[in-house]
Amino acid sequence: MIPAISNIALPAFDHTEAFPKLADMGYVGIEVAPSRIWRDTWRGLGSQDVAAYRKAIEDAGLTVVGLHSLVFDHPELQLFGDAASVSATLDFMAHLSGVCRDLGGHTLIWGGGRKRGNVGAEEAFARAVDFMQTLCERTAEHGTVFCFEPLGPNDSDFVNGLDEARAIMNAVGCGNLRLQVDAKALVENGEVEQAVFDDARDHLVHVHANEPGLDVLGRSGQIDHAMIGKMLADIGYAGYVSAEQRMLSETDYMNDARESYETLRRYYDAG
C-alpha cells in the first residue's frame, strides 16, 4: 500500500515548504482538500494556480492522489437541495474533476453536502443515481473517479456503509464511480469484517486512515488499524492509504505527520 497524507494536516494556504519534509519521512502522495490551499476554489481558481501547486508537489518528489473535502467551503452546494443548488453542485463537481485531472490526481472523495434530511431513502437513492450518471458522463474524459465516502450515522444520513455505496455504483453503471473506505466510518458502521472487504475488492480505489476528530493516527485507541490493514492486505489492495488528520498544532504539525506515517508503515504495509 502507498502512504499519503491530506493537506489538511498542514497550515492553510501556505504549506508548500512542507512537501520535501513529508517526502523525506516516506510519504509518496498528497491528498488535496481544495479549500486548504485556495481561498477561491471555483470561478476565481486559475489554471496557473493549479499548475503551480502541482509543480510544488512534484518538485518534492510527491504525487497528487486526488481530492477530498470537496464542498467544505461551499455549504450551499447540496446533493438533495433545491433545483438551483443541485445544478450548481453538478457544475462544481465537474469543475473539481477537471482540477483533479490537472493536478495529476485520480480520485474525488465525496463526503459532505449530501444529507438527505426529509427526502425518503428510496427517492434519495434514485436522485443520487441520476445525478451521478450525469456527472460521470460529463467527466468521463478526465481520467478521474468519484467515490461516495461511506460515513458514520453522526456524520451523514446518506451512504452509511459500503453496501449503500456499492448499490449506487452498480445502479449508475459507470466506470468512473468506484468505492472508498474510511477507517473511522468502518468502525462506526460495524464494517470491520472480512466479508465487507471481500465484497469491495474489485472496485476499491482509495482508503482514508483516520481517527475520531481527525486526530493523529493511532492516538485514540478506538480504531483497529492493524485489523483494517490486514483485511486490506488480504484482498490484495495495493493503492493509496491516506492519513486524514487535521492540523492539531501550529508548531508541531510535522511531528504529528511523522507519527501518522509510522502508523501507516506499521499497519498498512506502507512505505
What does each model-identified segment do?
Residues 27, 60-69, 97-110:
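Short coil-to-beta-strand
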Residues 22-25, 29-36:
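Basic, amphipathic N-terminal segments that precede the first structured/catalytic domain
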Residues 35, 72, 113, 212, ...:
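Flexible loop residues that form catalytic
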Residues 16-17, 76-178, 188, 255:
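Active-site acidic/histidine proton-transfer and metal-coordination neighborhood
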Residues 33-57, 112, 116:
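Glycine-rich, proline-tolerant flexible connector loops at the mouths of alpha/beta enzymes
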